[in-house]
């Protein structure tokens, strides 16, 4: 960190229309699915729209997505679409007359794997068939977001029941979620419902990324790519590690995944609550070193579901995630079902800008270089050199001309102090044409990387490679000036290819 002094705390940041480098993911729901509200969220700073398939039908989500497309068209703001799978869940069963039951501390209760029974104070059911085989006396069962703790006393496989003691007094409703901390659960990462959601809704709708719930090992991602088949190339996989098994296998998951989500909700039931900060820092640090985008999620501005201002702890939590190195911060209930979705995005955006202004980007750059094994790949060497050049020349912007977006993502890995304009260049096929992007996918994929601003440009391309590059670069700089990213007289670092050679150059904005 840098720039920490009393004057820095007292002075306001200049109100020059700056946008945060950190990206904002918003979960869409009842509070945020109309066209006017989606336009407000896009203008406030939403970069990724999350569709949570734990709730809602395909028709419901389709209506929301159609509205989002209209809002994007109206505002001319690009937004990526994320499908978040429900994943393999264990839930408690239905209750007699549908009424919640009262559990008392010290009372014993039987848990059955027969999901057809209607539960009461003596017996409840759970949806996991192998519960009796996987649990042993002394294990813990957490129900309803951890509000109820049951300790296993004995297991009876023939009858399919587990005898438990209740450790606290609480009320249990129907179909509440269940966690089994430390137990290796034999459930597929991709359930039949998930496959249906992805193949029947996600693929036809050209979604950009899938957030996979409860990823436990690297092979889970290999299997999901098999399910996606030919679509695996254009849909990014974002892994959510939500249990101990996933934490233990973190390195192999990171190798296989495209990006990552620190989903602190379920993880907080699986590991002690006082260790969550440690897991968050470890995951973000490793993602940063691997150059893979990471999203920090769950309860970031939770109180804003009902209140127009976040708690001090929440504001600090968002800022600390930025200081840890997260690429994106996420809103869940705040934007999906809260009373102040637009305000939540605006406040989150302001906190991110403030946190970013206190970062020591040069120290981060040096740490990245120190931790990257040699020899670097030619592309990585180029990307890091572009950032070093921008830091030394005090450039105001880095412009990257890229085909698939991977060069721009590598530049983002080295965390320059300035924004990165990622211009996705179409492949030249004819002598001259109006260049516009045939496929926006690479541009939308870059919306989860800190500091990356994708540009979909139009202009005319000349016959030769170097001439066309100059035209594209000129158009990109014009667009950057219009957006307020730089002004005439500023130095800008450009990174692009000419033929088979890669070039880094410093241009002065005209």
Swiss-Prot record:
Q: What is an example of a GO molecular function annotated in this UniProt entry? A: magnesium ion binding
Cofactor(s) for this UniProt protein: Mg(2+); K(+)
EC numbers, comma separated: 2.7.1.40
Where, subcellularly, is it found?
Cytoplasm
Instruction: Answer yes or no on keyword Transmembrane.
Output: no
- InterPro entries to which the protein is assigned, alphabetical: Pyr_Knase, Pyrv/PenolPyrv_kinase-like_dom, Pyrv_kinase-like_dom_sf, Pyrv_Knase-like_insert_dom_sf, Pyrv_Knase_AS, Pyrv_Knase_brl, Pyrv_Knase_C, Pyrv_Knase_C_sf
Q: What is its main location?
A: cytoplasm
Task: Please list the residues that bind Mg(2+).
Answer: 242, 266
Entry keyword annotation includes Transferase:
yes
Keywords, alphabetical? ATP-binding, Cytoplasm, Glycolysis, Kinase, Magnesium, Metal-binding, Nucleotide-binding, Potassium, Pyruvate, Transferase
Q: Name one GO biological process term.
A: glycolytic process
Binding, K(+): 52, 54, 84-85
Gene3D superfamilies, per this entry?
A: Phosphoenolpyruvate-binding domains, PK beta-barrel domain-like, Pyruvate kinase, C-terminal domain
Q: Which reaction does it catalyse?
A: pyruvate + ATP = phosphoenolpyruvate + ADP + H(+)
| UniProt binding sites for ATP | 52-55, 91, 176
Its pathway is:
Carbohydrate degradation; glycolysis; pyruvate from D-glyceraldehyde 3-phosphate: step 5/5
CDD domains for the chain:
Pyruvate_Kinase
Q: How does it assemble?
A: Homotetramer.
Q: Which family does it belong to?
A: Belongs to the pyruvate kinase family.
The entry's protein name is: Pyruvate kinase, cytosolic isozyme
Organism from which the protein derives: Solanum tuberosum
């Amino acid at each position: 960190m840098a720039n920490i002094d009393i004057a820095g705390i007292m002075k306001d940041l200049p109100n020059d229309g700056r946008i945060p480098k950190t990206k904002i993911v918003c979960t869409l729901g009842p509070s945020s699915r109309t066209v006017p509200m989606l336009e407000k969220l896009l203008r406030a700073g939403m970069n990724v729209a999350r569709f949570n398939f734990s709730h809602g039908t395909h028709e419901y989500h389709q209506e929301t997505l159609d509205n989002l497309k209209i809002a994007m068209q109206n505002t001319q703001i690009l937004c990526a679409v994320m499908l978040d799978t429900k994943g393999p869940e264990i839930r408690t069963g239905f209750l007699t007359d549908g009424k919640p039951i009262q559990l008392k501390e010290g009372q014993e209760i039987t848990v059955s794997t027969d999901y057809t029974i209607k539960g009461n104070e003596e017996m409840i059911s759970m949806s996991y068939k192998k519960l009796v085989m996987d649990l042993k006396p002394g294990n813990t069962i957490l129900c309803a977001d951890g509000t109820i703790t049951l300790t296993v006393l004995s297991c009876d496989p023939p009858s399919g029941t587990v005898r438990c003691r209740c450790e606290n007094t609480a009320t249990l409703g129907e179909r509440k979620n269940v966690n089994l901390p430390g137990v290796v659960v034999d459930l597929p990462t991709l359930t039949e419902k998930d496959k249906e959601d992805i193949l029947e809704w996600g693929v036809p709708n050209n979604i950009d990324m899938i957030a996979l719930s409860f990823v436990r090992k690297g092979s889970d991602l290999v299997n999901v790519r098999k399910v996606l088949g030919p679509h695996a190339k254009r849909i990014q996989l974002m892994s959510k590690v939500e249990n101990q098994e996933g934490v233990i296998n973190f390195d192999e998951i990171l190798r296989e995944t495209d990006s990552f989500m620190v989903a602190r909700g379920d993880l907080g039931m699986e590991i002690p609550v006082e260790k969550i900060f440690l897991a968050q820092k470890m995951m973000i640090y490793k993602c940063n070193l691997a150059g893979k985008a990471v999203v920090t999620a769950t309860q970031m501005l939770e109180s804003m579901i009902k209140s127009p201002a976040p708690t001090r702890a929440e504001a600090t939590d968002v800022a600390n995630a930025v200081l840890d190195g997260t690429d994106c911060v996420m809103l869940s209930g705040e934007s999906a079902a809260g009373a102040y979705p637009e305000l939540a995005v605006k406040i989150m955006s302001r906190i991110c800008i403030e946190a970013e202004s206190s970062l020591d980007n040069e120290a981060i750059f040096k740490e990245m270089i120190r931790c990257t094994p040699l020899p670097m790949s030619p592309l990585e060497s180029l990307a890091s050199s572009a950032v070093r050049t921008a830091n030394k020349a005090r450039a105001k912007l880095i412009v990257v001309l890229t085909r698939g977006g991977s060069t721009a993502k590598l530049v983002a890995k080295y965390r320059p102090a300035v924004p990165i304009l990622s211009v996705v260049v179409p492949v030249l096929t004819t002598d001259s044409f109006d260049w516009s992007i045939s496929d926006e996918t690479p541009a939308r994929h870059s919306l989860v990387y800190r500091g990356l601003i994708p540009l979909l440009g139009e202009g005319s391309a000349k016959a030769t490679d170097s001439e066309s590059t100059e035209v594209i670069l000129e158009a990109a700089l014009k667009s950057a000036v219009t957006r307020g990213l730089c002004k005439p007289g500023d130095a800008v670092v450009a990174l692009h290819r000419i033929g088979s050679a890669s070039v880094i150059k410093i241009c002065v904005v005209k």
